[in-house]
Amino acid sequence: MSHPALTQLRALRYFKEIPALDTQLLDWLLLEDSMTKRFEQQGKTVSVTMIREGFVEQNEIPEELPLLPKESRYWLREILLCADGEPWLAGRTVVPVSTLSGPELALQKLGKTPLGRYLFTSSTLTRDFIEIGRDAGLWGRRSRLRLSGKPLLLTELFLPASPLY
């Protein structure tokens, strides 16, 4: 099962450097904290609509593969993050199987819990980078994060209803 927003997310083209953009736009795109928390600060109830979740092989993650360790399998989670039931963000998380050990095994069991609720409670969370992307008038970003030094890649597309616009 797929969703048009996730097709567009995968079409994002990334800037080599942070572009000169409006301060408010950069504030959203370069946010280091939880996007879930930012949405809740808008006075909204945040929920997850699950699109796809499960193990995939390298051929299903061509955009992410150069940014992650080469492994036989990866945990893929594709969601819509909704505010008061309206989709504000499409998210795609790719986790190498080697990351899924110890406490990080919980990444497979998030269900309808927003990823940010898990990530930003961890004292071991670090971020290697944020890249800004754009496709057909929509903005997105991707970040390689680490939990206990173990990598995962998070890509987010801000949908038209998002307060980013």
From Swiss-Prot:
UniProt keywords, alphabetically: Cytoplasm, Lyase, Pyruvate, Ubiquinone biosynthesis
Entries under SUPFAM superfamilies matching the protein: Chorismate lyase-like
Record's subcellular location: Cytoplasm
Protein name, per record: Chorismate pyruvate-lyase
Enzyme class, first EC level, given as a word: lyase
Database matches in NCBIfam families: PRK11655.1
Gene Ontology biological process terms in this record: pyruvate biosynthetic process; ubiquinone biosynthetic process
One Pfam family from the record: Chor_lyase
Chief localisation class: cytoplasm
GO cellular component assignments: cytosol
Subunit organization: Monomer.
Listed HAMAP family: UbiC (MF_01632)
Enzyme Commission number, as recorded: 4.1.3.40
UniProt GO molecular function: chorismate lyase activity
Annotated family: Belongs to the UbiC family.
Catalytic activity from the UniProt record: chorismate = 4-hydroxybenzoate + pyruvate
Purpose of the protein: Removes the pyruvyl group from chorismate, with concomitant aromatization of the ring, to provide 4-hydroxybenzoate (4HB) for the ubiquinone pathway.
Pathway membership, UniProt: Cofactor biosynthesis; ubiquinone biosynthesis
Taxonomic path: Bacteria, Pseudomonadati, Pseudomonadota, Gammaproteobacteria, Enterobacterales
Annotated binding of substrate, by residue: M35, R77, L115, E156
InterPro entries, per database record: Chorismate--pyruvate_lyase (IPR007440), Chorismate_lyase_/UTRA_dom_sf (IPR028978)
